[in-house]
């Protein structure tokens, strides 16, 4: 749905990168037009949710789309091939007005943008040679039962799956608070780890137990879960953090991020996009969110 909404907001044509048709003997990405019935040359919705916005829709040669939306379930990736900072800011200003947005993150090369935290804030800027999204937008999550939020979570998702079929990829706590269990002679018995743990820690811990010399090939993003190992410490120190972007002008909204840290590594809990009316805006503008994302 996001590609449809963005194309409408920008008044640009929308093409489906996952569906092609022949036009005058040449392959063309199929036109997406929700206002018209499906036909031999156009469709109402992208097949997989992704979209090429603007340009000619020609398949062969360089893609000339102004904006590319990669649908990703609970979050979508937005690429601006021209690296046009003014366009990126325009997109974020528009996203900030949508009630389904749960957080906005932008490439730090575009500088400070009200309403958005940088991709670097969540560890998504590195040395990879693959294209980096200009913007990542997380969709809103909420609980149908506030007394049991993890088991009653609802998330908005840009996907072809139907309601009840399940989805992930959002930045809600129901997505990031997964469980992990380890059994074996190297692990403590009946131990419950209260420190933050992520999937990235599995490889580091297994490499340590198997004494694999991985340091010669680089380094892992995760840590060794020493507190869970037999003979390890009872606990490791960790901290909770909250940060927020500066607010947009109208409506006044900001992206807030909650995360934990230990051993120099960050573990991201959740993000939300909210009006900071009840918050100290000066703290938000300084990069600190004085309240949680609990909803």
Language-model-derived ranges and their functions:
Residues 1-163, 276, 283-294:
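Secreted, luminal/periplasmic, and some membrane-associated catalytic domains
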Residues 70-75, 181-187:
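Short acidic (Asp/Glu) and glycine-rich catalytic loops that position anionic groups and cofactors
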Residues 75-106, 185, 194-230:
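Non-catalytic, well-ordered alpha-helical segments in soluble enzyme domains
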Residues 76, 144-146, 169, 176, ...:
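Solvent-exposed soluble domains appended to multi-pass membrane proteins
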Residues 102-135, 194, 211-246:
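Polar, surface-exposed loop/tail segments
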Residues 151-186, 201, 286:
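Low-complexity, glycine/alanine/valine/leucine- and proline-rich hydrophobic stretches
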Residues 233-295:
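Phosphate/adenylate-binding glycine loop and adjacent helical scaffold
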């Amino acid at each position: 749905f996001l590609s449809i909404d963005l194309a409408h907001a920008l008044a640009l044509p929308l093409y489906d990168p996952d569906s092609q048709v022949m036009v005058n003997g040449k392959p063309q990405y199929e036109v997406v037009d929700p206002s018209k019935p499906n036909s031999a040359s156009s469709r109402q919705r992208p097949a997989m949710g992704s979209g090429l916005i603007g340009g000619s829709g020609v398949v062969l040669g360089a893609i000339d789309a102004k904006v590319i939306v990669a649908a990703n379930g609970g979050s979508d990736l937005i690429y601006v091939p021209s690296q046009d900072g003014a366009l990126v800011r325009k997109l974020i200003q528009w996203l900030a007005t949508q009630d389904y947005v749960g957080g906005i993150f932008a490439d730090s090369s575009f500088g400070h943008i009200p309403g958005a935290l940088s991709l670097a804030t969540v560890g998504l800027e590195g040395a990879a040679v693959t294209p980096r999204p200009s913007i990542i937008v997380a969709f809103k999550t909420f609980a149908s039962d506030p007394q049991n939020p993890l088991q009653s979570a609802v998330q908005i998702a840009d996907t072809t799956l139907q309601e009840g079929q399940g989805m992930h990829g959002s930045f809600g706590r129901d997505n990031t608070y997964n469980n992990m269990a380890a059994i074996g002679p190297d692990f403590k018995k009946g131990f419950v780890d209260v420190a933050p743990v992520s999937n990235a820690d599995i490889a580091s811990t297994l490499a340590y137990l198997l004494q694999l010399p991985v340091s010669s090939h680089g380094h892992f993003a995760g840590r060794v879960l020493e507190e869970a190992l037999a003979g390890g410490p009872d606990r490791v120190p960790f901290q909770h953090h909250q940060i927020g972007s500066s607010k947009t002008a109208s409506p006044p909204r900001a992206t807030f991020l909650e995360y934990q840290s230990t051993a120099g590594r960050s573990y991201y809990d959740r993000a939300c996009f909210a009006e900071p009316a009840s918050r100290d805006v000066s703290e938000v503008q300084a990069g600190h969110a004085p309240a949680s994302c609990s909803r």
